[in-house]
């Protein structure tokens, strides 16, 4: 049975390792995923998330961090052209099925990386991003997360059932639909999910 995995944080982990001066190989590593395990697990497609933090002490610029992870994604495709193939369309999946390669689809986990700019969203699409969460664990200009902000010290953390999408978030969903970019509702509040379904 072929595996189609919708999420991994390997791009961010490779970026962190690179920033720490201890780069890791995608061929074999101790991260969430590597090429050897993709082959052993009979992977068809792996969604590769560009994960960024919105906290200024963690990231100088969420958009820059996202672009650095996109660069890592493309360098992996260049490094392993006989093993990996980028997936942007349904037709690419059909090609992938007969290619003997493993597919990788570029995604973004934290819509705040766009800095509330529809132009940045369109640019990420042009760079190959085909799925994006509107938020992660932080309220941003698009939406609220599925946890109540400011409850980091509580366990279990209370669910956020009231804060949904902002007006800008609704604009983003409409533009993502126009672009045929998947809206990933992971991490989104219940109210945000209902806003999308309406």
Regions found by a protein language model. Give the residues of each.
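N-terminal hydrophobic targeting/anchoring segments and the immediately downstream early-domain regions
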Residues: 1-162, 198
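Loop-centered beta-sheet repeat module
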Residues: 159-197
